Design a protein with these regions (language model features):
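Conserved active-site and SAM-binding loop architecture
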Residues: 1-219
Length: 219
């Protein structure tokens, strides 16, 4: 497992080269989780209340879009490189294969998982929807409470948190293995706490239970 975090800025060419090199390996999974504060419901409210800060809010989306474009570019380069390294049938992936989702592209594409909170507005923007179509991604629900996501502060401390993610991936087998939804008939809504305060930022971190399931599903 190789993590690309805030220290590995996607604005730097060195980061892109390192990422492309990793993705050349035969069995790789690319879990894409980008800063998405610009699309969260709270940001939408703040934009309405603080129109004088519109340039700041717009910058969030500009950065998100740029980083997704960079990841998309690296995925294409890696897919082409993987096909050339394999060279088992003399057929290489081309840019045209990627854009048209040909069987050649599907054969050499790494496992791709794109994650955003379910209610994040970035799911609705054109360039994210285009990325999903281009990479043949299917959406799956991922409810944090089923992976023991609990509050750590205030009245929510120790309670399960109502946090919903959606993952879009190009493997139905993998997606179905990590997908999970809260069942109201088993888990009472009263057992949940809303994400707020200090817990809001911290829920951006995955639980150990979720990380373990991701690794088991990919193994």
């Amino acid at each position: 497992c190789i993590r690309f975090t805030l220290e590995d800025d996607l604005f730097y060419e060195s980061t892109l080269r390192n990422l492309a090199e990793v993705l050349k390996e035969t069995k790789t999974m690319t879990w894409i989780s980008l800063p998405c504060i610009g699309g969260c419901p709270y940001t939408a409210l703040n934009r309405q209340r603080n129109p004088q800060k519109e340039s700041k809010f717009a910058m969030y989306e500009t950065h998100f879009k740029f980083m997704l474009e960079q990841v998309d570019k690296v995925l294409t380069e890696a897919c082409i490189a993987r096909s050339k390294m394999a060279n088992d049938d003399g057929i290489f992936v081309t840019d045209n294969d990627v854009y048209n989702n040909t069987t050649t592209y599907v054969k050499y594409a790494p496992l791709i998982v794109f994650e955003l909170p379910t209610k994040n507005s970035y799911w609705t923007v054109d360039y994210v929807q285009a990325f999903i179509r281009k990479r043949c991604l299917t959406k799956f629900p991922l409810h944090g409470c089923r992976y023991n996501l609990r509050g750590k502060h205030g009245i929510a401390k120790g309670k399960l948190l109502r946090k919903e993610w959606t993952v879009a991936c190009n493997s139905h087998n993998f997606g179905s293995r990590i997908a999970t939804q809260c069942n109201p008939s088993i888990c009472s809504p009263s057992e949940h706490a809303r994400v707020s305060g200090k817990d809001t930022k911290e829920t951006g971190n995955y639980t150990q239970e979720l990380a373990d399931q991701v690794h088991r599903s990919f193994a």
